[in-house]
Design a protein with these regions (language model features):
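Active-site-proximal, substrate-binding regions of enzyme catalytic domains
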Residues: 51-72
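Acidic, PIN/NYN-like endoribonuclease modules and their adjacent C-terminal/linker elements
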Residues: 2-4, 101, 105-134
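Alpha-helix capping/helix-boundary segments
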Residues: 11-12, 39, 73, 100, ...
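Active-site neighborhoods of divalent-metal-dependent phosphate/nucleic-acid chemistry enzymes
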Residues: 65-112
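Short, well-structured N-terminal submotif of metal-dependent ribonuclease cores
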Residues: 1-38, 45-58
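Phosphate- and divalent-cation-binding pockets in alpha/beta enzyme and binding domains
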Residues: 42-43, 76, 120-121
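A generic structural signal for well-ordered alpha-helical segments
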Residues: 28, 59-60, 104, 122
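Histidine- and aromatic-rich ligand-binding microenvironments
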Residues: 7-8, 36, 92-94, 131-134
Length: 134
């Protein structure tokens, strides 16, 4: 695997549950799998209790390179949603999905996911996506 990845929450959950396999462990350890703010916030929202929140946040910051959204992110998410609407599939993508897809496009990353919505986005945009599980 020679590509770099932006991990979505759906894949991040599988990774931390140890469902992803050793290939992904190696890629994460090598710094080839990054994280963006919408995913960090969505993941941490599900963490129970204050100590667990800070422990999980520290771990995310230590393990994953951070990919920031560029200034045009909102205009680009609007354009992506319109592109999906033109294809009749705009209801598939949540605001977080749109942000993840656009941030990945901005940095030329492959979206690492376990969410059929990214497959739908990829069919419309042609952007690279990969499922963390098979």
């Amino acid at each position: 695997v020679s590509e770099d990845f932006l991990i979505d929450t759906s894949a991040l959950v599988r990774f931390y549950r140890r469902q992803a396999g050793s290939e992904w462990d190696r890629l994460v350890e090598s710094g080839r799998v990054g994280l963006c703010e919408p995913v960090r916030q969505e993941f941490l929202r599900a963490v129970g209790g204050r100590p667990a929140y800070y422990e999980a946040d520290d771990l995310l910051r230590a393990v994953f390179p951070y990919w920031a959204a560029r200034d045009a992110v909102w205009a680009e998410t609007e354009a992506l949603q319109r592109q999906l609407a033109d294809a009749g599939v705009h209801q598939c993508a949540s605001p977080v999905d749109l942000l993840v897809a656009v941030i990945a496009q901005q940095h030329r990353l492959t979206v690492l996911h376990q969410d059929a919505d990214f497959e739908t986005i990829a069919r419309v945009t042609g952007q690279p996506v990969r499922r963390i599980l098979g």
